[in-house]
Amino acid sequence: MANFVLVHGAWHGGWCYRDTAAALRKAGHRVLTPTHTGVGQRAHLSGENVTLETHIRDVLGCIEAEELDDVILVGHSYGGMVITGVADRIAPKIRSLVYLDAFVPEHGDSLMALLPKALPPEVSAQFIGGFHAAALDKHCGLMQPIPAELFNVVADKRDWVNRRCVPQALATYEMPLLLAGGGSAVKQRVYILADGWDPSPFRYFAKLYDGKPGWQVVKFPCGHDVMVDMPNELAEKLAALG
């Protein structure tokens, strides 16, 4: 039995791992799917004071409260920022880091700072400009969800994803991640690329880490929300790490 902590991405909640978590539990694993402050069932806690640090502490608190060790820590999309921060602080408790079509930051990076590295200039500028405009004009500091259609989520689950995603604090994307270097102690890292949608910033990270010591890069033929599109296949891949 392995201990899995599945960390969701922007606008989502722990709900997005429903089917993957069920498959892992059926196989006998312990699975936690924490929801970040300000989204999902915790949307009532949203506000401009919610930052990347808030979400890192959410996951740290979950692991510490459940007294978990030897954790396989999975982060989807924006969740890659979160799990990197978590691993930096409690690396001895982490067996593996899994970046699920996710950002892989280094010291000082914010998500907004990573977009120009991972996308063509005109595309990254459009993303960043659109995010700021929506946050300022519509919901005062909250970034609006990107529709599931643009992430090529499987058609019969798009409505489910769209109705459950909620705006997220812009500050979570703008806060630089400050690292002390502790995460380097985690020796097993996996990058899972969702190879069925574009324009994807995550091809940049898959290419960057492919072939590097300690990294395994695999591709899934689906849209960005791998845990929604291919939940059982994802569970099988994750279970193999246990």
UniProtKB/Swiss-Prot annotation:
It holds the Pfam family Abhydrolase_6. Its main location: secreted. Induction: Constitutively expressed. The active site is at residue 77. It is found in: Secreted. Keywords: Hydrolase, Secreted. Coiled coil: none annotated. Signal peptide: none annotated. Candidate bioremediation enzyme, which could be used for the degradation of carbendazim, a widely used fungicide that is quite stable in soil and water and poses potential threats to human health. In addition, due to its broad substrate range, MheI has potential as a bioremediation agent against various pollutants that can be detoxified by hydrolytic cleavage of some carboxylester, carbamate or amide linkages. It is an enzyme of class 3 (hydrolase). One of its GO terms (molecular function) is hydrolase activity. Its EC number is 3.1.1.122. GO terms for cellular component: extracellular region. It catalyses: carbendazim + H2O = 2-aminobenzimidazole + methanol + CO2; carbendazim + H2O = N-(1H-1,3-benzodiazol-2-yl)carbamate + methanol + H(+); N-(1H-1,3-benzodiazol-2-yl)carbamate + H(+) = 2-aminobenzimidazole + CO2. Belongs to the AB hydrolase superfamily. Catalyzes the hydrolysis of the fungicide carbendazim (methyl-1H-benzimidazol-2-ylcarbamate or MBC) to 2-aminobenzimidazole (2-AB). Following hydrolysis of the carbamate ester, the carbamate decarboxylates spontaneously. Can hydrolyze model carboxylesters such as methyl salicylate, alpha-naphthyl acetate and p-nitrophenyl acetate. In addition, shows substantial hydrolytic activity in vitro against widespread pollutants with carboxylester, carbamate and amide linkages, such as dimethyl phthalate, propanil and chlorpropham. This is Carbendazim hydrolyzing esterase. It comes from Nocardioides sp. (strain SG-4G).
